[in-house]
């Protein structure tokens, strides 16, 4: 059984962008969108397998029929920061409602020497 819980988006982004053992602490703030663990797993898979390393403008949608939540992830820009390959990625998450909430977040992550991505 999946348990719904209030998720703090920066922590979600840390889980999405960092390897499982590489989770990082980030500043936190509340969100109106409640995501399930299955939602988080879908977002992580999209970022890891279909967004990182792809051309700028790549936009991949995700939808979880079990929770009713959906959204998309978009690679907005590639850049070099302190000699590291980095990507600016936008996240849009939409709740099943009612009411329906849509929230947008933007993070820059950089490729680490060990092959993981870390939010900077």
What function would you assign to each model-found segment?
Residues 1-9:
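Bacterial N-terminal signal peptides that target proteins for export
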Residues 9-18:
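Bacterial N-terminal signal peptides
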Residues 17-25:
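Sec/Tat signal peptide C-region and signal peptidase I cleavage site
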Residues 24-120:
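Extended interaction-bearing regions that mediate binding to partners or small molecules
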């Amino acid at each position: 059984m999946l348990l719904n819980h209030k998720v703090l988006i920066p922590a979600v982004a840390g889980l999405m962008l960092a390897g499982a053992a590489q989770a990082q602490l980030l500043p936190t703030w509340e969100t109106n969108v409640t995501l399930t663990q299955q939602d988080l797993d879908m977002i992580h898979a999209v970022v890891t397998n279909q967004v990182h390393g792809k051309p700028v403008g790549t936009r991949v949608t995700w939808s979880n029929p079990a929770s009713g939540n959906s959204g998309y992830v978009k690679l907005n820009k590639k850049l070099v920061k302190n000699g590291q390959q980095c990507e600016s990625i936008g996240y849009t998450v939409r709740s099943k409602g009612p009411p329906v909430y849509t929230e947008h977040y933007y993070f820059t992550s950089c490729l680490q020497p060990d092959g993981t991505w870390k939010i900077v």
